[in-house]
């Protein structure tokens, strides 16, 4: 049995899913969206993402965190923002000792 926390990062909405793999069988355990208020300062939004991901790690005790790679077209500003959300997620994984993979 292996539990993995999957993350689709973003500063406005960060999606997550928790999956249990037993052999070749997969089961969804949890999933949702971490939403932040665009009117809040960025540092507070990132702190909210970090805190919620840390809570999810403590609740589900995953063997790993899988985080979506950074993809962007023409909008470098969006890519920078998503990169900051990725950093908040990676910090949660690092501080709880859970390996993080892209």
Residue ranges and their predicted role:
Residues 1-102:
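Phosphate- and other anionic-substrate recognition elements at nucleic-acid/protein interfaces
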């Amino acid at each position: 049995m292996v539990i993995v926390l999957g993350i689709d990062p973003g500063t406005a909405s960060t999606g997550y899913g928790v999956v249990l793999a037993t052999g070749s069988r997969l089961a969804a355990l949890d999933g949702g969206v971490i939403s932040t208020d665009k009117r809040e300062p960025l540092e507070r939004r990132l702190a909210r993402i970090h805190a919620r991901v840390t809570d999810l790690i403590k609740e589900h005790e995953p063997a790993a965190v899988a985080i979506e790679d950074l993809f962007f077209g023409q909008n470098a500003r969006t890519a920078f923002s998503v990169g900051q959300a990725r950093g908040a997620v990676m910090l949660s994984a690092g501080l709880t000792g859970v390996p993080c993979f892209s």
